Amino acid sequence: APRSMRRSSDCFGSRIDRIGAQSGMGCGRF
């Protein structure tokens, strides 16, 4: 699902690769 992650990449981008789900849950998930 690279399309779904591309939308959240607008907030952290490669940071999700270092933090993991914590970054996506604080920016694109919530």
UniProtKB/Swiss-Prot annotation:
This is Natriuretic peptides A. Disulfide bonds join C11-C27. The record marks R3, S4 as: Cleavage. Keywords: Disulfide bond, Hormone, Secreted, Vasoactive. GO terms for biological process: blood vessel diameter maintenance; cGMP biosynthetic process; receptor guanylyl cyclase signaling pathway. Pfam families: ANP (PF00212). GO terms for molecular function: hormone activity. It comes from Pelophylax ridibundus (Marsh frog). Belongs to the natriuretic peptide family. Hormone playing a key role in cardiovascular homeostasis through regulation of natriuresis, diuresis, and vasodilation. Has a cGMP-stimulating activity. GO terms for cellular component: extracellular region. Cleaved upon secretion to produce the functional hormone. It comes from the Eukaryota. Residues 1-3 form a propeptide. It is found in: Secreted.
